Amino acid sequence: MEDDIWKAVDLSGVFDEDSVELRPRLTSVSSPSLSSTPPPSPLSSPSWSEEELPAPRSDGSPASSISAHKSYPKIFQTFKKDLSEVTVDRLMYPSFYERVQISIQTEDQSWLQRISARKRIKRIPSIEITEAPQENLASKLRENWVINPEEPKLSILCEMEFNEDFVNFFETSLRTLPSIGPPTILSYRKEYSCMDVILKDEQELGATCEFCGSDLQSLFFNMDTSLDDAGTKGKSHRSCCLQFQNLLDYITEERLTTKSPEMELISISPHAAHGSDADRLKAKEKAMQRKQERQMARHFTIIPEQSPVGTEEDTKHLKTISYQLSGDYLQNVRTEEVDLQITNISITCCDSWKICGKVMGNELLEKDYKHGSKFLTSFPDGTIQIFYPSGNLAIIRVPNKTDGFICIIQEDTATSPAILALFDSSGRSSCYHPNGNVWVYINILGGQYSDQAGNRIRTWNWSSTKPTPAFVSFKPVLLALNRYIGIRILEQDKVSIHFLAMGQQATICLGTKVVLQDPEEVPTLRFLSGDDLLLLASLIKIRRLFSKMEGCVNFPVSKAWERLKQPSYLSSLSLKLLALCQNSGIQQNIMETITELIKENE
């Protein structure tokens, strides 16, 4: 029964007649479970299967029943595609033709493995060897980067059962792969041993003279190049030519000049004392005498220049000159200002500070802005620090050496801030313009106000220093140093600094009360210098000369212009200038010069 089934299957193309062991075991041929799929319909059956089906037998053998129930594997049923137009090469794909049913073949795995091994041997395609055209290096590199689908390896993958599905799903991805396998850096490279390499021995070339070309080996063999023999004169056989002899002489001279001198070793063994005992005693007495002379010179004063100079005979007897550098230094003669020359002055400091209208004492206190940065810090010694909203230091007040405080105001700059104002409790203060010129300057006697160019606009004296009440009362000075700091000078004892930023306010008062016992000794207009008064006198003289020139132009023939007097305004200016000279307290010689300039008879 089993032999008849194999004859009906007709696998003579694959199995030999003697290979009975390769046939799988058939447990149940007529079992309905072996036909896993229903018979294909005539619409879906491929054309090539109809041509190769064997003719059914009339005797009703079991082979006819098996062929009637033949079916395709399940994988062919998933692809609902018409295969009528597919042409298959029988020689290349013999596995596509009718064979044993899949249900019978898959029963024994060992049988399938042996069959697949034989198929692999038969399906190896022949590779045609063709001469490759000559290509450059760039084309070879591009071939490694891109996979050519026409290569034999890729064609083997494409010639499969599902050609169209392979092309749709796998061909594009294979073309994008840069390479197949591990990176080239990991590839095996055979290391060649250097056992077969024959190394040649180095050959010493003979030394030849570069000047004449003669052999120098015998010359160096007979010549001694040590330093001991370098000073001796060269013999005739030592040089082959004059140029080479000059070179040897130059090298010898250089070696002698660069040769380090020999070290002389001294004896460190104990030796007897130099000189006799009497000589050592005399040396000690001389040392003691010089020491006493230096001590006496410290107590004596310097000999004045008027002292008589000794004669030459006296100088000859002097054997030892002893001197010592003086420890005195020149003291700088400090020119006292006019303010300090005034006697009987009583100065009282009026220092205080407030926060939001509340008077504060010398205590440790810290306050911050709303955004968290520090606003004010005060210490028990009276030091106060006020900061801008940016965090830069705005005002600092520190104790003075004698009494009171010193207050410094800086601009809102992180690096190298300029000083805007400087106040002192002793009565001296100054404020500056943004360009650095003095804006306001005050002292214990008065003050002056200048513009941005440095020109003095007005001056004043404090009420406590006025000798008579004839002067105009002082007008308050209000300054705004920047958008946060303002200065108010209402009186000598009412000088205040106001700081206002982001709702925080602080006020520092630095007033001074000065009481003079004799106000008459203070000049009324002490701010006017002699140079200013000389300029005013020269101005009056120039205007008077212009007035005379105008008279000459108006009366060129007549001499009536000689009888004309100077304008009345020049006369009044002259009187005012003389009054200024008397009130400013200038020197007498300057007063006489001004009087000569404003004379009317010139």
From Swiss-Prot:
Asked if the Swiss-Prot or TrEMBL record annotates the protein with the keyword rRNA-binding, the reply is no
Its domain of life? Eukaryota
| Localisation per UniProt entry | Nucleus
Region annotation (Disordered) maps to 22-67
Query: Is Nucleus there in the keyword field?
Result: yes
A single GO CC term for this protein reads: nucleus
Q: Where is the composition biased (Low complexity)?
A: 25-36
Q: Keywords in alphabetical order, please.
A: Nucleus
Instruction: Indicate the family of this protein.
Output: Belongs to the ERICH6 family.
PANTHER family noted in UniProt: GLUTAMATE-RICH PROTEIN 6, SIMILAR TO CHROMOSOME 3 OPEN READING FRAME 20
Q: Provide the protein name.
A: Glutamate-rich protein 6
Protein's organism: Rattus norvegicus
